[in-house]
């Protein structure tokens, strides 16, 4: 099963790196089950050939509006003729980990995209890793702090938290403490459950720091207090692409790389969405993590 996961996911990583035109010489003997880089897989041409033969790439929790994944999926299908499927696009990082642990093989993803807060669960003490060691083609360009030395996981992309808001809001929100203002009652939201969603947790952390709290990940008291005050005024709205594009949500934190993709979609629907970095504190978190499933 590792061979199947590796072929599909490793080829996808090549495309994401923007270097699909590179070809590497094939080796004389290839054991794809043991390959830990493109050379050991028989070269890029062989890897692409095997991916085309498989014909599908199973992903999980990678919505089209997230980090330009929609365009990446389309480009992958066009370049290789491989069908991309995505399980639970709007799920959380914890959902991905839980799926790897408990889902039957037919429901297992080839590759995962998770927040750094759950990466330790890929290598549980005393148990076998949930991921396979593989060094993607641009491995040397990834900082050591953003990857496992053996290739069990690696950082792929990252960004800063921005305030996304509907231009109809007045006054214009500029910092986390603005969220509790009565002018924004019923419009403020969060991207998910902070206990399972990396983006949601980082939103609480940013709100905490912006309100004079600690920068320690283990103490987000000030942020929780802020969202509690907001919720006391009106229920929190889910800050996602659909709600922002329809006007159901008008204010919240979001990664800048996601805001950049949602704003054009909202414009097409006749809404003026904007984003700006908070004036009190700008949070840049560690990169999101990719890994190849071992199952």
Regions found by a protein language model. Give the residues of each.
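Extracytoplasmic low-complexity, Pro/Thr/Ser/Ala/Gly-rich segments
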Residues: 29-57
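A ligand-binding cleft/hinge motif common to bilobed small-molecule-binding domains
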Residues: 118-123, 245, 251-271
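C-terminal region of N-terminal signal peptides and the immediate post-cleavage residues
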Residues: 2, 18-33
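Extracytoplasmic ligand-binding site segments that recognize negatively charged/polar headgroups
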Residues: 58-73, 87-101, 107-249
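Generic structural signal for residues in well-ordered beta-strands
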Residues: 84-86, 188, 273-275
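Periplasmic-binding protein-like
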Residues: 155-160, 223-229, 235, 267-293
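Short, polar/charged alpha-helical segment
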Residues: 41-52, 62-83
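N-terminal export and membrane-targeting signals
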Residues: 1-13
